[in-house]
Amino acid sequence: MNAKAEAKESRFDLLKWLLVAVLVVVAVVGNQYFSAQPILYRVLGILVLAVIAAFLALQTAKGQAFFSLAKEARVEIRKVVWPSRQETTQTTLIVVAVVLVMALLLWGLDSLLGWLVSMIVG
């Protein structure tokens, strides 16, 4: 990991994670408790609690490390050379052709073995 990503754990990290867990439980229980209310209000309540929980989680050492990992992953994704549409289509057609050939070979082998067993048995 990156040296910047390795943040020292605070003594309040456990308290923050417990608070995150409590917020998630409150969201789940609140959604069930207020099931008679319109769905819009329940979704808004869950979103508010989720944003608060995410903010608290990102304040911990593990949360900061996760955020740093996500930023580095985004940078790496931008470096990937993605195949063109033509390359993707050609590769897909090759895979389909190989699957069909293998299916025919296995079907033929199964038929041959079935015929041999039926000749031996009866």
From Swiss-Prot:
Annotated keywords: Cell inner membrane, Cell membrane, Membrane, Protein transport, Translocation, Transmembrane, Transmembrane helix, Transport
This protein's GO CC annotations: plasma membrane
Main location: membrane
Domain of life: Bacteria
Listed Pfam families: SecE
GO molecular function: protein transmembrane transporter activity
Listed GO biological process terms: intracellular protein transmembrane transport; protein secretion; protein targeting; protein transport by the Sec complex
Membrane topology: Multi-pass membrane protein
Localization: Cell inner membrane
Transmembrane segments: 14-34, 38-58, 93-113
Protein role: Essential subunit of the Sec protein translocation channel SecYEG. Clamps together the 2 halves of SecY. May contact the channel plug during translocation.
Subunit note: Component of the Sec protein translocase complex. Heterotrimer consisting of SecY, SecE and SecG subunits. The heterotrimers can form oligomers, although 1 heterotrimer is thought to be able to translocate proteins. Interacts with the ribosome. Interacts with SecDF, and other proteins may be involved. Interacts with SecA.
Sequence similarity: Belongs to the SecE/SEC61-gamma family.
Protein name: Protein translocase subunit SecE
